[in-house]
């Protein structure tokens, strides 16, 4: 496959789209399955399209070019005591802002404050006609094309090429505390997740860990309050408070997907807490398969070893009626049940009437 083109400005990105009959914008390709497209599709790398365009700490918003590594943004925010609460995945691996938006990937922190979709405010993007358009805005209270930026989250770049993105951010918490709670299995873990999610503890992150026998519960806020809440939680379930170093190791491994098999398929599954046990049973029959349940039981990540045929997982997910998308590896892009809403076709026709960007079937 030819090397991707590397436009360095939004105008160059628009020109590159107009110059090719079929295109797809890609970032750092930390989720490589999403950029596996037919050979006639020209890849447009956004790696040269990087930098923070505007950052207003007092307004809690920033605007950055799509190819900007999320790590650079996180560092700039940290200097002002702010952060992106949704725990962007593959942060240390070089994931870009545009790739994070198009993949719709969020980490454990999504549980309390929401995912990528809840923080995006506006975009500049190139549509299928090569027009550089702006939707949304640069302030929180804005209704200019408000829904379209959110619609682009998880779109896999099939509606246009992102050039610039505006996000809102939050003040960083004063302190964090992580508990590792014992769970004898999937059903027990599901009960812990459900009860903790409905509690008054305001958990920042709530995950069934890949070890299959424990729940990671992260709290954020004033240190004295966290200590009191942790005692209450440990009176309800057996477990322990982790040291800061132990906690950082766990959450970093989850965020960077280091728990997953290297080289195997990694599949993101949309779930609800009531199907956790069924999903665990389904994947346990696949040798060496690993599972991580995140966001309080609302998303699952399944990692297959290289020797397991993806069709086996696909069959089980379809049997459970669970939609899934493959992020890494050679499994089908849509690796589960799938129902495409009618609005998706209407938006595709409006933004890309010539089919310049790949269809969602590619």
Question: What positions do the PLM features span?
Answer:
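N-terminal glycine-rich flavin-associated loop
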Residues: 1-23, 46-93, 105-138, 173-181
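Short cationic amphipathic helices and targeting signals
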Residues: 3-6, 62-64, 177-182, 212-225, ...
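Glycine-rich beta-strand-to-loop/alpha-helix junction loops that act as flexible
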Residues: 24-31
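Conserved glycine-rich FAD pyrophosphate-binding loop
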Residues: 37-40, 47, 240-362
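Short, conserved charged micro-motifs
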Residues: 71-73, 186-191, 224-231, 275-281, ...
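FAD-binding subdomain of flavoenzyme oxidoreductases
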Residues: 86, 93-206
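A conserved active-site cap/scaffold subdomain adjacent to cofactor or substrate pockets
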Residues: 176, 182-183, 191-243
């Amino acid at each position: 496959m030819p090397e991707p083109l590397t436009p360095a400005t939004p105008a160059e990105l628009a020109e590159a789209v107009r110059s090719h009959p079929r295109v797809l914008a890609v970032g750092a390709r930390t989720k490589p399955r999403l950029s596996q497209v037919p050979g006639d599709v020209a890849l447009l790398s956004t790696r040269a399209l990087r930098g923070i365009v505007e950052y207003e700490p007092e307004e809690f918003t920033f605007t950055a070019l799509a190819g900007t590594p999320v790590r650079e943004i996180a560092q700039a925010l940290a200097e002002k005591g702010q952060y992106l609460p949704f725990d962007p995945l593959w942060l240390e691996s070089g994931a870009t802002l545009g790739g994070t938006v198009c993949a719709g990937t969020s980490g454990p922190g999504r549980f309390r404050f929401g995912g990528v979709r809840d923080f995006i405010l506006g975009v500049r993007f190139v549509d299928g006609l090569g027009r550089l358009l702006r939707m949304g805005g640069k302030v929180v209270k804005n209704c200019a094309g408000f829904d379209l930026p959110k619609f682009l989250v998880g779109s896999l770049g099939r509606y246009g090429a992102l050039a610039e993105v505006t996000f809102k951010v939050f003040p960083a918490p004063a302190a964090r505390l992580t508990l590792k709670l014992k769970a004898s299995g999937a059903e027990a873990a599901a009960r812990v997740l459900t009860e903790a999610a409905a509690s008054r503890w305001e958990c920042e992150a709530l995950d069934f860990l890949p070890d299959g026998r424990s729940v990671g519960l992260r709290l954020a806020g004033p240190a004295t309050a966290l200590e009191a809440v942790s005692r209450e939680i440990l009176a309800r379930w057996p477990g322990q408070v982790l040291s800061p170093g132990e906690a950082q190791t766990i959450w970093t491994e989850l965020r960077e997907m280091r728990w997953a098999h290297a080289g195997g398929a990694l599949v993101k599954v949309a779930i609800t807490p009531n199907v956790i046990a069924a999903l665990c049973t389904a994947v346990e029959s696949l040798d060496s398969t690993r599972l991580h349940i995140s966001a309080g039981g609302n998303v699952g990540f399944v990692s297959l070893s290289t020797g397991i045929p993806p069709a086996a997982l696909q069959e089980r997910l379809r049997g459970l009626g669970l939609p899934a998308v493959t992020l890494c590896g050679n499994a089908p892009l849509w690796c589960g049940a799938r129902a495409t809403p009618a609005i998706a076709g209407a938006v595709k026709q409006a933004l890309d009437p010539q089919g310049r960007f790949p269809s969602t079937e590619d």
